[in-house]
Amino acid sequence: MNASAPVLADPHPVLAASAPDLDPGALDAVRALVAAAERPVVLSGAGMSAESGIPTFRDAQTGLWERFSAEELATEEAFLADPALVWSWYRWRARMVRARRPNPGHDAVAAWQRRTPGLEVVTQNVDDLHERAGARVLAHLHGSLFEHRCADCGAPADVDPGAPADEATAGSEADLEAMLREAPPACTVCGDGLIRPGIVWFGEMLPAEPWDRAFAALEDCDLCVVVGTSGIVQPAASLPFVALGAGAAVVEINPVETELSGAV
């Protein structure tokens, strides 16, 4: 399998069924794997943050999500066509995340890492809830809502998304309406480009360094725990199979079955 930084692929639907309840024997087996692991990796996806009130990328598009297609906004073409709309959309998402709190799942991962310093966290999420729970994150595969750079010269930019005056309005229709059509700032380094979100959009290359760190960790781990990821978006969906190929145990924690489920 090629370890070079790949391109974020468009999602393709897969058939999923409700996962069966985990029996006590399986729970005991997972506990034993966790207790014995010295180099575990937690690979987290959007489901990890759903209990914090952050909608998953593919949640039913009701309310606000009916107004805009997330897939259509998450492209370079969308930013070039309407930079103010895309910029406002991502600032709104960052403000919503800022008003949310880590959930017990984030806390459990952070506590496990304190007990097992060799544990690495690799996430597909663009929020900062793992960090706010106290975990050290090895790689944000798809970037971060809280990092920005120039769309032309690539220079990093320090941009504060701000917070709603009332945190209860974060992620609301009113907060989005207040932010829509805010133009992105100009780059202070080159003076020509616009500042864009530090997110990996569909069709873009994943940042090489985070991908290389994640790939190396999965090749070297003795346990991979996959939490809340649909297994749809490549290349991140291939990482558990890297661990399997290297002889590691893989545990999947998901409310539905994925393409990985039949292999673990």
Give names to the regions the model predicted.
Residues 1-264:
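Conserved catalytic core of sirtuin-type NAD+-dependent deacylases
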